[in-house]
Each structure stands twice: as C-alpha cells, then as structure tokens.
Amino acid sequence: MTKKSASSNNKVVATNRKARHNYTILDTYEAGIVLMGTEVKSLREGQASLADAFATVDDGEIWLRNVHIAEYHHGTWTNHAPRRNRKLLLHRKQIDNLIGKIRDGNLTLVPLSIYFTDGKVKVELALARGKQAHDKRQDLARRDAQREVIRELGRRAKGKI
C-alpha cells in the first residue's frame, strides 16, 4: 500500500488548505492522475487550485472533480478544459478498500495536495469525515490553549516570571 505524503524532495504544486479545517483526516493515499500534456505544463508553472475539489467513485474508478488547472498560456487548440474530471490511478485493492469504507461510514475523499515525484504528477488523497461546527470550535480552542502553553514556557525559559 502506498501511503506516503508529499516529502521534502517533491515539488508541491497546490494544496487544499481548507481540507484539514473542514474534515477530520482518517487515512491518506498517494494516487497517480491521468492528465493531458498541456495540463502537466500548466502544473509545472504552478497553475492549479484544489479549492472545493473532491473525489468520487464511478463504476469502480475514482475520479477527481472540480480541480482547476488553468489553461496553458502557450497552448493552442489542443488546450484542455480547466475544470474537467480527471481519473485517479490506484491499485484495485486500494480502490475496493476505499469503496467499502466510503459506503460503510459517512466518509468522503478529499485531495490534500498535488505534487511532482520523479517527473510524475501525484495527488495526496485523504479519506476524511466532515467536521461539525462544534468540532471546529473545539479544535480552535485546543490550538489556542496549546499556543498559550508554549508562550508561557518561553517566558519561563527567558526568566521573565
């Protein structure tokens, strides 16, 4: 199973910053993506957005939807549609496992990032559960409390108390 996130030697093109705020991440997967040539060139220029992106299962295949990859500015009539659906490449066992988990629970597939690994475009895909408003408030309160603890420890280390 290829469970790894974008490491430091990979060039990250786009990240979904709201995903960790709106969802509880349960598991992550690395998936390949089927792209056209102008899409790869546009990604190399960093022209992508994962805002409002999600993945769905259709006929035993996983499709990435609502990802915006801008048209390649040097492209001609061969340019791609910016928000077309793109097929994700995973092993059959991984796809079957994801389908089972999605059907069993209230889970969804959310792309966390798009990056290059050895010249190939990869998507970090997360199996996630949506957060309610009270969950978001609890996370915010927990982060504030942690920040206060760190601030207090810094003051004590400097001898200001």
Swiss-Prot record:
Concerning InterPro entries, the annotation shows: SmpB (IPR023620), SsrA-bd_prot (IPR000037), SsrA-bd_prot_CS (IPR020081)
Q: Does the keyword Cell membrane apply?
A: no
Keyword check for Calcium, yes or no: no
State any single GO MF term.
RNA binding
Q: Which Pfam families match?
A: SmpB
Cellular component aspect of the GO annotation: cytosol
CDD domains in the cross-refs: SmpB
Q: Which HAMAP family match?
A: SmpB
Task: Say what the protein does.
Answer: Required for rescue of stalled ribosomes mediated by trans-translation. Binds to transfer-messenger RNA (tmRNA), required for stable association of tmRNA with ribosomes. tmRNA and SmpB together mimic tRNA shape, replacing the anticodon stem-loop with SmpB. tmRNA is encoded by the ssrA gene; the 2 termini fold to resemble tRNA(Ala) and it encodes a 'tag peptide', a short internal open reading frame. During trans-translation Ala-aminoacylated tmRNA acts like a tRNA, entering the A-site of stalled ribosomes, displacing the stalled mRNA.
Q: What name does UniProt use for this protein? A: SsrA-binding protein
Organism classification: Bacteria, Bacillati, Actinomycetota, Actinomycetes, Mycobacteriales
